[in-house]
Structure formats: structure tokens, C-alpha cells
Amino acid sequence: MNKAEFQKRYGNSIGQPKLSLLLGEAKTPFEAAKLAVGWRFLARKNVGQGQTVLLLPGFGASSSSMTFIKRYLNSLGYKAVHWSAGFNHGEVGKLLPQVITDIKEHSEQAQAPIKLLGWSLGGYLAREAAREVQQNVSRIVTIGSPVIGGPKYTAVKTLYDIRGLDVESIENSTLKRFEHPIVCPI
């Protein structure tokens, strides 16, 4: 799908979320505290059956930001694993090859396709990496990630601009990858 086809399908109305939505992220520490208190009330059925789930944190976050999710998935019988990149610095061109390597390695270890769970930019990376190694991915779960497009349509676009990262270049490569549709469920 090229840019013209993308705009024909989705229009020009896609843009960054409002700043007020980004400010909602400030509630994260309070939400984490509520989760810690309510932890024992969460469902605990063994539904994962040892399936591997690769966790990808959002922009500006490290693997430790996914600790609650990892513990919960493990308690459900999944084998949740952190990505090897550590801190998500937002440089998609550098992170994407590492995510692809992680997917291949964990899929090979599991001898089966794995699931990907990405938060924000981590969800974008999960989605785009899955295009490259579809045979290694059984499902993609995203939390607060754009379903179409890339960082250009997120609240962190301004941070990309400040850091001098070219969101148009990232967007153009995303549109080029649309030529290869994702076949696993998202």
C-alpha cells in the first residue's frame, strides 16, 4: 500500500492524539499501586500451557516496565520473556532488527510460533516485526498502540521531532511494509 492508497482508505483525519490523553499517562504510578493491591483478585487459570510471549515495552521504557504483565502472564501458565534490547529509545530502524532476532530465537527455543505483546511503540514494533517473520508469530497483542501507521500518529511524535528522528521516513517504510499483510491475529 502506498501513501495515496493509505490516505484513500483511511483519509487525512488520522493525527496525533490530544495532549490531554498523553497527560493521562501520569496516572501510571497510581494504577500500578492499585494493581499491586488487587493482584490476588486477578484470574489465575492455567490457560497459557507454556506458550512463549515476547514482551516489548513502549517508548522511553525498559523491560522492567513490563514486570507486572510478565508476572501475570507467567501465573496464567505462559512463558513471558523480556526482549533483549533493554531500553526502548525509539529508534525503530535499530530496534526492529533486534526484535526480529528475538522472535526467531524464542520461536526456535519453543519449537513453535510465539505470541508478541507490545505496549505503545512496542506494539508497533511487534506488528512490524511480525510482517518479516510471520511463520514465527502466532498472535500479536498491542496495548495503546496505533493499529495503522507508525509513531507519526502517536502522542510521542513531538519527542521524535525534538530528538531529530525522521517520523516521515519511518512512516514511509511502514507504508512500504503494508504491501506484506500480517496474517496472524492482532
List each language-model region with its residue ranges.
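Flexible, membrane-associating and regulatory peripheral segments of lipid-active enzymes
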Residues: M1-V53, L76, Q109, V156
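Serine-dependent carboxylesterase/thioesterase catalytic core
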Residues: V53-S64, F68, N74-V183
